[in-house]
Each structure stands twice: as C-alpha cells, then as structure tokens.
Amino acid sequence: MPITLDPEKLAIVMKHRFQYKICRECGARNPPNAEKCRRCHSKNLRPKKFKKK
C-alpha cells in the first residue's frame, strides 16, 4: 500500500485498522463500543494501540 494516500483514504484506513478494542485476557478483537469481551466476557478491554514510526 502506498504511503502517500490522500487524507480521505488515510482516515478510512485508520478507522478500520485502529478503532477497536483488544481483550487483555484472551486477546480477542471487539467492537469499539464493547464493554465486555465477546469471547471470554471479561470487562478488561483496552483500545488498539497505534505505533508511529
């Protein structure tokens, strides 16, 4: 994927790649508005980390 994307496409990519939550216990991906994990029903969720280069 090219690095030089237009801002609209970059916003779409960032939304789909980084707007979800990760369960700290089982590692499952959950929707951004989740309060409990879909797999293990834990409430220990964190937002997906974004690493800048």
UniProtKB/Swiss-Prot annotation:
SMART domains, A to Z: Ribosomal_L40e
One Gene Ontology molecular-function label: structural constituent of ribosome
Record keywords: Ribonucleoprotein, Ribosomal protein
InterPro entries: Ribosomal_eL40_arc, Ribosomal_eL40_dom, Ribosomal_eL40_sf, Ribosomal_zn-bd
GO BP annotations, alphabetical order: translation
GO cellular component: ribonucleoprotein complex; ribosome
Entry-linked SUPFAM superfamilies: Zn-binding ribosomal proteins
Family in the record: Belongs to the eukaryotic ribosomal protein eL40 family.
NCBIfam families in the record: PRK04136.1
Protein name: Large ribosomal subunit protein eL40
Species the sequence originates in: Pyrobaculum arsenaticum (strain DSM 13514 / JCM 11321 / PZ6)
